[in-house]
Design a protein with these regions (language model features):
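Short, solvent-exposed amphipathic alpha-helices that sit
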Residues: 1-11, 107-122
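Hydrophobic/aromatic beta-strand patches that form the interior of the parallel beta-sheet core
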Residues: 16-18, 45, 86-88, 127-130
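N-terminal beta-loop-helix "entrance" segment that forms/cooperates
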Residues: 15-39
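Glycine-rich phosphate/pyrophosphate-binding loop and the adjoining helix
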Residues: 119-185
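N-terminal beta1-alpha1 ligand-phosphate binding loop
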Residues: 1-18, 152, 156
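Helix-loop-strand module that forms the ligand-binding subsite of alpha/beta enzymes
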Residues: 33-116
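Generic recognition of short, well-ordered alpha-helical segments
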Residues: 1-4, 29, 57-61, 142
Length: 185
């Protein structure tokens, strides 16, 4: 599913797809390069599988190295101020497992709290995730194509500034109802 989502946006003009594992197979992250990329974009999306209620390890390494005091946060750190930040994730469990009475005890939103706190510290605008759940049950090819198409539609809407940001604040997932959050031109 993650490959299909990435492929759905790879060819979009005005959108940068940046694969950390491809760029840094040795985990030696070029901090200056990554900071430049962040400065050049208004929307930052972490697209990943939701491993053990978190991001893959390279994303944690990226956060630890790239979001430096004085650049991303602190009294002088304003490089990310006002930028939009969210996760596009896939998870094995379905929506019923990500509830207080479910197998995972917490909602996806609650499990993403450390990233929301990071966004807040960096003065970024946090948005709910684009979430594809139930991956462990297997997804039919048609459903994979549908989710990938929705992801492309949403990323395109962000690029074209067609997202109604007021309407997304209270939604659990950006893709809960794309028709309600994408303004018609």
């Amino acid at each position: 599913m993650n490959r299909a989502m990435k492929a759905a946006v790879d060819d979009l003009d005005g959108v940068t797809v940046h694969d950390l594992y491809r760029c840094y197979p040795d985990f030696y992250i070029d901090v200056a390069r990554e900071q430049r990329l962040c400065e050049e974009h208004d929307v930052i999306i972490f697209q990943h599988p939701f491993y053990w209620y978190s991001t893959p390890s390279i994303m944690k390494e990226w956060l630890d190295l790239v979001l430096q005091h004085g650049w991303a946060y602190g009294s002088e750190g304003r490089a990310l101020e006002g930028k939009y930040y969210f996760h596009a994730l896939t998870a094995g469990g379905d929506d019923s497992t990500y509830r207080h009475q479910g197998a995972n005890l917490f909602t996806i939103s609650e499990l993403l709290s450390p990233y929301r706190a990071t966004a807040n510290l960096c003065r970024m605008r946090w948005l709910p995730p684009f979430a594809v759940l139930g991956i462990h049950q297997g997804l039919a090819d048609e459903l994979i194509r549908s989710h990938a198409s929705d992801y492309r539609l949403m990323v395109t809407a962000f690029r074209d500034e067609m997202i109604d940001l007021e309407s997304v604040i209270d939604t659990p997932y950006l893709n809960s109802n794309l028709a309600d959050i994408i303004r018609q031109s």
